[in-house]
């Protein structure tokens, strides 16, 4: 492996929530980065150009996942590829085919460029969606979502991520590409980009009053900085292989709103569950041991949620209360 300072890596979908942090940390570590975006001149990618080291070592390449030639040009000459780009939608036509074809195109372009490794950003959606799994089963890298269940419930995002990951494994095996996959859960944390992405919107709606109640359901969370660091760890660790579940905690939505209301009592955070007739859903068990074994230390979920809200305030997506002192944070693990 060449020294980091000599390495050129490609990050697809560089303007995204996870990818922006990935680009930031790669630049800080001394990598030269090629980031693919649909339009390098779009103001929404301006935050990337402002990153430390961007002027010297970041190139934004115009590319589309469905345009093989554009990907080929971006990846040619790279040592590694981080494939984070993906549609985020429950429209089957916009999700499934672009995710699968785009992933195959990236793997093929990586094979042609003879890159050292591809790190593919999959999702918990490719792992968790299985109604027949025993509640006591520990969710880990051996688990896969049930495709029929995803289709029948019209959960096209999870279905698309699952079939895209399967396509990545098949294509990588056929083309001889060293592929490692990361499966993050719902990603929270500070925003680098100017827009609010879908995962952070999940928290924002609890603070703006648009959500009057919280669901009787559970959600797994992880900090965006940890996800970015995990990508780099999987790229830099020669013995890394297979899939890696990236999760810090599983919380009931009631626990989430309780944490938020303690930190930010000035916001109209819901206090009632939308479903009081059924028993409270219990958090599922999961294992993040594979990433811990590589040395990743996870940010506690309370700290992550606090930093998410502070970022939403700083970016102007959430009004900042004026008549309140800053809370003293005592974050318990």
Curated annotation (Swiss-Prot):
Q: Supply the SUPFAM superfamilies for this chain.
A: NAD(P)-binding Rossmann-fold domains
A Gene Ontology biological process noted in the UniProt record is:
lignin biosynthetic process
- Cystine links in this protein are 150-158
Which EC numbers characterise this protein's activity in its record?
Answer: 1.2.1.44
| GO terms assigned for molecular function | cinnamoyl-CoA reductase activity; nucleotide binding; oxidoreductase activity, acting on the CH-OH group of donors, NAD or NADP as acceptor
Question: Keywords assigned by UniProt?
Answer: Cytoplasm, Disulfide bond, Lignin biosynthesis, NADP, Nucleotide-binding, Oxidoreductase, Phenylpropanoid metabolism
- Give the active-site positions: 161 (proton donor)
Effect of altering residue 150 to A/S? Increased activity
Expression (tissue specificity) = Expressed in flowers, leaves and stems.
Reply yes or no: does the keyword Lipoprotein apply: no
> Is the Ubl conjugation keyword given for this protein?
no
User: What does the record give as the reaction this protein catalyses?
Assistant: (E)-coniferaldehyde + NADP(+) + CoA = (E)-feruloyl-CoA + NADPH + H(+); (E)-4-coumaraldehyde + NADP(+) + CoA = (E)-4-coumaroyl-CoA + NADPH + H(+); (E)-sinapaldehyde + NADP(+) + CoA = (E)-sinapoyl-CoA + NADPH + H(+); (E)-cinnamaldehyde + NADP(+) + CoA = (E)-cinnamoyl-CoA + NADPH + H(+)
Q: Where in the cell is it found?
A: Cytoplasm
How is the activity of this protein governed by pH, according to its UniProt record? Optimum pH is 6.
**A GO CC annotation given for this chain:** cytoplasm
Question: Which pathway is this protein assigned to?
Answer: Aromatic compound metabolism; phenylpropanoid biosynthesis
What does induction of this protein depend on?
Answer: Circadian-regulation with peak levels occurring in flowers during the light period, in the afternoon.
* PTM notes: The formation of a reversible disulfide bond reduces activity by perturbing the positioning of nearby catalytic residues.
Modes of activity regulation: Inhibited by sodium iodide-mediated oxidation.
Summary of the knockout phenotype? No visible effect on the emission and internal pools of phenylpropene and benzenoid compounds, but increased accumulation of feruloyl-CoA, p-coumaroyl-CoA and vanillin. Reduced lignin content.
User: Which positions bind NADP(+)?
Assistant: 13-19, 38, 44, 64-65, 84-86, 157, 161, 184-187, 199
Question: Where this protein primarily resides, as one coarse class?
Answer: cytoplasm
Family indicated by similarity: Belongs to the NAD(P)-dependent epimerase/dehydratase family. Dihydroflavonol-4-reductase subfamily.
Cited function: Involved in the latter stages of lignin biosynthesis. Catalyzes one of the last steps of monolignol biosynthesis, the conversion of cinnamoyl-CoAs into their corresponding cinnamaldehydes. Mediates the conversion of feruloyl CoA to coniferylaldehyde. Also active toward p-coumaroyl-CoA and sinapoyl-CoA. Involved in the production of floral volatile phenylpropanoids in flowers of fragrant cultivars (e.g. cv. Mitchell and cv. V26) from cinnamic acid, a common precursor with the anthocyanin biosynthesis pathway involved in flower pigmentation.
Q: What is this protein called?
A: Cinnamoyl-CoA reductase 1
Please state the gene responsible for encoding this protein.
CCR1
